[in-house]
């Protein structure tokens, strides 16, 4: 079995695959932890889900938080006796990356694109990842990674208001029933949710026109906040494990 780990700005998200089937999922705060803390956590979460650590034959990591990388890699070697595969610049992806500097593309965005083109071949695809940042990736039917857009995510937008103003509070991120808030909290929740929704609609329209000349596209959504937009007609498919699937596929491309 293969343990796939996505190190994001807010959480470490992981899963265990048996072949192409995911057997378990877990989350952990990605605030910097020692290698021992990470190793103990990983072994514990596996055992709690009736997955013996000894069944893990391969570990693959995708990270956008460099300060966690060394500790996590050390944990894999010390606690699993496995040198993990790291999805990074220079590895095989199966994509033609059109960024001016391909090294700049986040590993999580590459993982999403790998999984998207594998699951939905020969299609023009927009992937929206609703995480700490909300990211858009445009991938052509020929597996060209064309680029995309990045904007603050819902949590980041709400936190910016509470941290940079004197009287605006921190709020829970929810889909409000009314766009017209009747309290400060409701107004922030509405502004954050419908502001991101509106931005997404505009970006989809513009990317569709600019990247794909209005040709048929498929829109995929993933990330921790994606389900909040499930009834808004933004996307064709919600794929919660897209990044983990991409990490697994990248590892299979690059390791024996």
UniProtKB/Swiss-Prot annotation:
Keywords: ATP-binding, Coenzyme A biosynthesis, Cytoplasm, Kinase, Metal-binding, Nucleotide-binding, Potassium, Transferase. Substrate binds at residues 99, 106-109, 184. The active site is at residue 108. It is found in: Cytoplasm. It comes from the Bacteria. GO terms for molecular function: ATP binding; metal ion binding; pantothenate kinase activity. One of its GO terms (biological process) is coenzyme A biosynthetic process. This is Type III pantothenate kinase. The gene is coaX.
